[in-house]
């Protein structure tokens, strides 16, 4: 690896850890603010869950980027996992905000998650990567 690639890798890792740290600070602020104001009565657990899933998504995205930079190829499993986590996060946001989920939206969500699950299974069985 040349110096430019190493510098780019270092900057990407630094930005990743900064983004993760800022999400954790936001998470801790949310918890302490709820404790101070409502003594856990108003603690909205879906906000905490969404913030934790944000951290996982940030980590997965940057891991994919770093592996693509290092190996000069993209691991399909990382993209599928990130897409699944992101989609589950979006579903949880809709469900925990008590919005009405239409039947067509529910079927579409199930089909998308099912397709991603099948893709993940096929990847694990056949180990296909994109170069």
Swiss-Prot record:
What's the main place this protein lives? membrane
Q: What is its subcellular localisation?
A: Cell membrane
Alphabetically sorted, this entry's keywords are:
Cell membrane, Membrane, Transmembrane, Transmembrane helix
| Membrane topology note | Multi-pass membrane protein
- Superkingdom of the organism of origin: Bacteria
Q: Which residues cross the membrane?
A: 7-29, 49-69, 76-98, 102-124
One GO location term (cellular component): plasma membrane
Write down the Pfam families for this protein, in alphabetical order. PsiE (PF06146)
UniProt-recorded name of the protein: Uncharacterized protein aq_293
Q: What is the lineage of its organism?
A: Bacteria, Pseudomonadati, Aquificota, Aquificia, Aquificales
